[in-house]
Amino acid sequence: MEYSDAMHRLVSGQDGRVYLDTSPRVCIKGAEERDGLGYGLLADEDVFPFFELRSAAVDMRGASQKSYDNAELRKRIAAQLDTCMAAGVRHVVLSAFGCGAFQNPSPIVAETYKQEVRKRKEHFDVVAFAIFHAGYGPDNFGVFREIFEGA
C-alpha cells in the first residue's frame, strides 16, 4: 500500500494525532500450512472487537544511533495516546514501536512510553504492550518488562 502525503503526515503524528479507525474489527485466523503452527482459535466468548490505530515509527535502518531524535519519538508516542484519549479509548494495546525491523532503541522507546503514559494515566484503564520475542534478535520484551516493572 502506498500512502498519500496526507496519510503519511497523519500516521507520522505530524499534527499531534495518528490514524484511528473506530469501526470495530475482529481478526480472522486462516488455516495453517501444517499442524503445530500458529495459535489456537479463541472460544467464541473470548473473541472481541478492536479499533485499528496506525502510527509510523522512524526508520533507523542504516542510520547512526547518534542521529536518533528522541523529540520525534516522543511526539509520535504522544500522538498515539492523545488520539486514543480524544476518541474515548480507555483500553489500548501498543507495540515495541519501531524496535524491530526499524531498529529504534528499545530502552529509549520503552522509557518514553512509560513517561507519556504516566502523564495521561487517568485517561486509560488498561495500557498493554503486545511484544513477541522469538528467542532470537533483540529482546524487546525483556527491555519493556524491566522498564515497566512496578509502573
Residue spans of the language-model regions?
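Macrodomain-like recognition of ADP-ribose-binding/processing modules
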Residues: 1-151
